[in-house]
Amino acid sequence: HLIQHFHFDKNNSKIKFTLKQGSTSALLDGLEEEKYDLVLCSYQENRNNINFVPITTEELVVVVSKLNPLALKNEIDLQELQNEYFIYYSKHSGLRPLIDDLFHSNNIDPNILFEVEEDSAILGLVDINYGVAVVPNIPMIDHFHLKKLKIKNPQKKRIIYMATVKNRYAPPAVHSFCNFIVQNSNID
């Protein structure tokens, strides 16, 4: 929707976009290698030449197969997941530290069955009842036969950042889009 709104301004209607998706690490590597002008991603430590600007948040939820007995619930205490198998983000994912911290702060050592990089892979494995997962509350969830459970404790949100390389020249179109993103951010 962001690009569509950007194109509504007639001054921006001729600007073309190429979109790529991947893990935070891969996207930031591509940004540093000048494959991308900007990246929307999670924050990643030790990227000193990258400028991270928070632009929005996403609530974290637990997703379970509709075949899982937990699907009868609407919300869940993380302690109730002690005996579940987890489909988990890989160490390359920008979400991994946030989810690790969520479990660590609740003294839970998740029983990780699979580690994957993409949201769609996680949702697909949960859909076939291989395990449960903690994921951002994204529209893609609705394309699977899953039940979303609100997390009772603690409320954690993923912050999405716009990442650019510090002190790198940005063409006017990129500069204009970056300003548009910042002006339309809804960080809370």
What do the predicted segments below correspond to?
Residues 51-61, 137, 144-159:
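Short beta-strand->loop
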Residues 42-50, 105, 119-147:
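A ligand-binding cleft/hinge motif common to bilobed small-molecule-binding domains
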Residues 31-40, 60, 108, 126-133:
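Alpha-to-beta junction loops
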Residues 1, 84-106, 170-178, 188:
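Secondary-structure junction motif
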Residues 1-48, 115-116:
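Central regulatory/effector-binding core of bacterial HTH transcription factors
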Residues 148-188:
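A late-sequence structural motif
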Residues 47-86, 172:
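Flexible hinge/capping segments at coil-to-helix
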Residues 23, 77, 117-118, 136:
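Short loop/turn segments at beta->alpha junctions
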